[in-house]
């Protein structure tokens, strides 16, 4: 276990978000917890999911799905946290109603044990940056917790931000004529009105490296289907 932590520390650099480092360290303290990356589809559009799993055999890619019941135990009428995370982030290609969105992926849904969501988002952003142009928040609904994640990305110097435009269906004026950057701004307008372009939900985010994915792969904590 000490060796795994040393290997992880070799991947760290000054730019990495400290919350991500903390979550990686917590994962590596557990002997068999990793992240499953798998492909799906929805209405003819490709989806990708990033989910915490228990790795049974990394060589054969055998795993078991974690559930909320894995995150705590009941003892002496008390609820005790096990330290095992549960959760997922699902992303998808932009739907027609979304707009082109600069070719980025769009978050379709997410749920995670408190404190372990940002790591899944980090993996999703790195993957989407290598397999597309980046990642943008759900265009209509973002939870308060997820909103803090996006606000953090907006302030990080190692994350590239690209402004997305409104679509013709949005009740605000578009910023430019070209449509390639058009992306539904329902959530941005709902929280910021005419200043929607200043909302963290109005951007597409990307990352130039895969340091977190590389570290998790090196530790045998990524399963890809």
What are these regions (language model features)?
Residues 118:
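Residues forming the Rossmann-fold NAD(P)(H) cofactor-binding site
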